[in-house]
Amino acid sequence: MTSFSPPLQTFLDAAPAVALVEVTSAKGSTPREEGAWMLVSPDAIFGTIGGGQLEFMAIDAARALLAGEGSRHMLDIPLGPEIGQCCGGRVEIGISIADAVKRNELLRNAKDEDAARPHVYLFGGGHVGRALSAALSLLPLNVMVVETREDALADMPQGVVTRLTPVPEESVRDAPSGSA
């Protein structure tokens, strides 16, 4: 899976004004869990709180906040036919301006989450290694393909780290504890 922190850093660098949209309560059947979050700028979003009308309403409220309409918003949204979302649960959303402290906290947490992902090492970047790396890159894993042939490492899936080395066994010694 692509590392979370670099795209987050890029988003924050490009957006001087950002609202944090957080699921503060999720009851019943909901698209995302309590604690899920996304960021909204005047012209872009990062992340998701579940999509659909719920997310559209939250984005609109976040952009209103960014436009100076209040200092914090709370939304209590029943997910039913009234809004065209069939989940059936109820979600409370908190929306606030992401100041420098909150931005740094989000980045620190993203880096910690990236580092905590399990590490998977694939030895060989041929057709099997490429297929495995493509499948594993979709999961919350740190995937590395270790190979002795430079051309076998070309065009690996996004988020897959590659290592060209004449002695692949050395990568085993460098692997974090618990790697597969």
Question: Where in the sequence are the language-model features?
Answer:
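Segments forming oxygen-rich coordination pockets for charged ligands
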Residues: M1-L164, G178-A180
